[in-house]
Amino acid sequence: MTANNPQNRYDYDVVVIGAGHAGTEAAAAAARLGAKTALLTTNLDTVGQMSCNPAIGGVAKGQIVREVDALGGLMGEAIDATGIQFRMLNRRKGPAMHSPRAQADKKAYQNFIKYRIETQDNLDLRQETVEDLITEPIADGQDRLANQRVIGVRVRGDAVYHAPTVILTTGTFLQAIMHTGKSQSAGGRAGEGTTAGLSGALKGMGFTLDRFKTGTPPRLNARTIDYSGLEEQPGDDDPQPFSYLNDAISSPQMACHIAHTNERVHDLIRANLDRAPMYSGQIDSRGPRYCPSIEDKVVRFADKSSHQLFLEPEGRQTCEVYVNGISTSLPRDVQDAMFRCIPGLEKAAIMRYGYAVEYDYCPPTQLWPHLESKSVSGLFFAGQINGTTGYEEAAGQGLIAGLNAARTAASKTPWVPSRQDAYIGVLVDDLVTSGTDEPYRMFTSRAEYRLLLRQDNADRRLTAQADELGLIDAARRERFHRKLAEIERGTELLQQAKFQPETGPTVRGDVYLRRPEVTWNVIAEQVPELAGIGREAAEQCSIDIKYAGYIDRQQAEVHKQSRHAEKSIPVSFDYDKIGPLRNEAKEKLTKVRPLNLGQAKRISGITPADLALVLAHLENNSLSQTKSSASVDKRASSDNESSRPTSSASDSL
């Protein structure tokens, strides 16, 4: 939509639409960079709300939260302040697999995020309903691909927010429909409506939209659960914080509990599949593979006689319990009957029924790696609108979109972490390069260099870059440098210490620490000076030393792979000019517009032969340009020489 002259106009550098986990991180990041930012949401009471499970982190997700924190984001501090149970997953595996996870006090988490947004400099939080995007055409030649630019948004009530950059973080609210049995209603979350106008606006701009589905389980009243026969799942004895600003977690922890479904439950579900929207044909959108509904579990894993259910308290001052593992859109009467068949839950009262949500998303191959639209300059996308699932994935995207919107508004070049620098880099690259045909969830297996992308070293990977970008404050900077100094001091002390093993010659402390049975604490008992090294610095020293060989090999592999991978490809590169290139390759490369050979390599269907042709063409172009430049220089030199007087002429003068 083009601009007119509304009665009320507000001017900003960045406007963010939606105040969930992506929107709050986006707005906060833009504001930290000094951009005048507006965060618009239809309901101020749902800022930072946990729509589904009351937890942060998990396998690979916990690493993303640590990265968001290392870049100055909100999520790590929020869960440290409001968590009610902390666990480090995969402790029995190597450090690359360690993943922090915490249960949250749902309302306390939401209030923490909202207050941080309200008190952030350069940021205005407004309750508004956005009805349209305002754009203007771009003159030919001003942008190599985009044919229009965003200049603001129109909200309900004859008002306009003008800005050179806009970020869409609309979650599951685009054209959203909720399903419980045959019952349907418009809305992206129970008790709330949908955002219909923006889907139409995006389609009108030429964007392709598709549909995904997600779901949520029932919530039970804790007072009606018989915990006596359920397995208790406590938190860690030594809970570790998510944020690098915190040394420890001191708040008391609450236990979760484990229940199990059985054949009675499964038979009930099978008997009612014709009433399940996913199986009756009422829903034809694809849902998250790794968070299936209980209906899906019973059908897909028919040989299993039982499925685990995790009973997760939603806070310290509520009786609501989230039943992780039984997401469903079956009718209410079936949900009631299911719980009556589960030991410990026979008398459980449902406080909120489960439901499924269908919603529009924008396939992310329409974006550049910095999450700006290829066709509409200044328009950014982050979170579930890009086809992802999960609070953590949304937060990571939000931060990247926010900082790049602010940089774009200030006419600065974009910044995106690479795949070898961060899980966030893996996430963004996967989305914009390959897209996704199902809700995308991060796993450690998606990262080629996961030994380098550990949860313990996110600050060492990213905080220095965050400082250069202007994302962090002085307190975080000083704390980071103190930690680096501690790591250096700890390494020096280990190298200076001498140990006499039971067999063999005397060895240095760092050499002794490489032994599998030797821990930091064993050495610290004999080197009192190590007592001054903090827990995180000690952990870093230990991992650096124990896994030095593996880390060195992975870093060498990164260097090897990046030799050609970093070869840049012009945005307007014409693949049709490469005669021998397969038509499939031409189509896919033109669609994605990879910025370098590394990104081109990761496009599905692109072969090594295709890459070789592209590389050869790039090098030939470069060589031709070099020769052309040299020829011009030579002609210019010749012209200059001919314009100078010869020696004989000089003599005659």
From Swiss-Prot:
Where can this protein be found? Cytoplasm
Single GO MF descriptor: flavin adenine dinucleotide binding
Binding sites annotated in the UniProt record for FAD = 18-23, 130, 195, 384
Reading the lineage from the top rank, the first entry is Bacteria
Keywords, ordered alphabetically: Cytoplasm, FAD, Flavoprotein, NAD, tRNA processing
The answer to keyword Methyltransferase applying to this record is no
- Residues reported in the UniProt entry to bind NAD(+): 287-301
GO biological process per UniProt: tRNA methylation; tRNA wobble uridine modification
- Single GO cellular component term: cytosol
Q: Provide the primary localization.
A: cytoplasm
Question: Is-annotated flag, keyword Zinc?
Answer: no
Which Pfam families is this protein grouped with? GIDA (PF01134), GIDA_C_1st (PF21680), SAM_GIDA_C (PF13932)
Biased-composition ranges, Basic and acidic residues, are 632-642
SUPFAM superfamilies given in the database record = FAD/NAD(P)-binding domain
What does the record note on quaternary structure? Answer: Homodimer. Heterotetramer of two MnmE and two MnmG subunits.
Which family is it part of? Belongs to the MnmG family.
Q: Which PANTHER family match?
A: GLUCOSE INHIBITED DIVISION PROTEIN A, PROTEIN MTO1 HOMOLOG, MITOCHONDRIAL
What is the protein's known function? NAD-binding protein involved in the addition of a carboxymethylaminomethyl (cmnm) group at the wobble position (U34) of certain tRNAs, forming tRNA-cmnm(5)s(2)U34.
Record's protein name: tRNA uridine 5-carboxymethylaminomethyl modification enzyme MnmG
The gene coding this protein:
mnmG
